[in-house]
Amino acid sequence: MRLGEKSHLKTHGHHSEEGFSVTLADTGLDCMTGGRLRKVQKYIDGDTFLLTYGDGVSDVNIRRVLDFHKSHGKIATVTTVAPIWRFGMLEVAGEGAVTNFTEKPKGEGSISAGFFVCQREIFDYLGGDECIFEHEPLERLAKEGQLMAFRHDGFFYAMDTYREYQHLNDLWNRQAAKWKLWEDVPALPRLVSNR
């Protein structure tokens, strides 16, 4: 997709999905995550909606997250995963001897995977352009008992650095992308017109 003076939309392959609408909204360069969400409120239909930051990939079952969200009646659900350490973890004795080494272990606790299900009431928690969704709105929802966590134990990987970008592209190119849950559909033949 290219926007601007010479806008262009290209569809890759043949897809059977129906009823999808994509809206691109310019929320400004200086607007923070909560402010961006507030600015797109007018484009969101219905009482329940999904949102993600778009910088992580996962094999999370979105239907299960949505069902979990509907089961508890709270304002928001965040998908959580175990933290993954970027470096090996060492246990070191007092004199410097390494007693245990674990390469890039999964940590204890939970971190946000950045996949959310929200009710429209979420907009009551958002401020202006400076509002950071991950701070005051989510902190307030948690204090009020309106934020639930859906634990995902499958694949999750964030793409925040060039190194992560390279790793994820390598997985894709080797056809080892665990987040690719869809089947490729052969493209339909193109009809050539002389018009």
Residue ranges and their predicted role:
Residues 1-53, 64, 161, 190:
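Conserved N-terminal catalytic core of the sugar/cofactor nucleotidyltransferase
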Residues 92-93:
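Extended acidic/charged loop-beta regions that coordinate divalent cations
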Residues 46, 73-74:
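Short, high-confidence coil segments that cap the C-terminus of an alpha-helix
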Residues 48-50, 57, 62-70, 81-85, ...:
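Catalytic-core segments of class I nucleotidyltransferases/pyrophosphorylases
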Residues 88:
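Glycine-rich phosphate-binding loop of ATP-grasp-fold ATP-dependent ligases
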